Amino acid sequence: GSTSSYFNQIFAQATTALYADLAEVYEADTDYAPGTVVSFGGSKEITVSATEGDPTVAGVISANPSYLMNNGLTADHRAIVALTGRVHTSVTGAVTKGAMMISAGHGHARASAAPAMGTVIGKALENFDGESGIIEIVVGRM
């Protein structure tokens, strides 16, 4: 393929990527920084996750996805949302490696020992003992 010619199918035995998440482009109500936790809703498809344990959580804004779906979307504000894989995420509170992560409001995630069904964003890949910061998590429905 090229910028003017596209192929519909790729046949390969294996492929590799420098980055580690699969993401999709959604229309957002504003621009969001990488690591922001977002939910379905607002005036467009995606908005910042504003409530704790949000059951409408969609994922985390990705900085550099290895594979990007729906890249042809044209919108005033495009949100590249990590759907699965490793992604840096804004967190608040103490986090233990392996903890299930849910929305904490204000675009952050937090650890939860007993999350409600449909609220888990992913699992923490590292410990964190600060008030707020960025850690790597594995995004995906657990």
Where are these regions (language model features)?
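Extracellular receptor-binding modules and their adjoining Ser/Thr/Gly/Asp/Asn-rich linkers
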Residues: 6-142
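Extracellular glycan-interaction patches encoded by glycine-rich segments
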Residues: 1-3
